[in-house]
Amino acid sequence: MFSTRGVLLLLSLMAAVAAFGLFSRPAPITRDTIRPPRAKHGSLKLCPPGGASFLDAFNLICPMRRRRRSVSENYNDGGGSLLGRTMNMCCETGCEFTDIFAICNPFG
């Protein structure tokens, strides 16, 4: 009925199809699916937090600051230092110029 050669050919074909994932389906996306936060369009992802890329951006952006803003007006949620939170946010989700402006010259 079936020859050994035919069975081997059928098994090798099934193994090749399974290896390329042709029978697999992607997992359905539900409301409970955890997605990593996406970077905002036009934002800078500066990783690692506090690394050379963040320091370079900080040194380039802060001299461009035009108006003074109180740091406590915008960022007063009490969860650690503003600089540390900004560095982590810039690495995880990306940050814009205005996010870094808020930490420029906090004493001036």
From Swiss-Prot:
Residues 1-19 form the signal peptide. Its main location: secreted. One of its GO terms (biological process) is dauer larval development. GO terms for cellular component: extracellular region. It is found in: Secreted. Disruption phenotype: 33% reduction in the larval diapause in the presence of dauer pheromone compared to wild-type. The keyword Transport does not apply. Involved in the regulation of the larval diapause. Belongs to the insulin family. This is Insulin-like peptide 17. It comes from Caenorhabditis elegans.
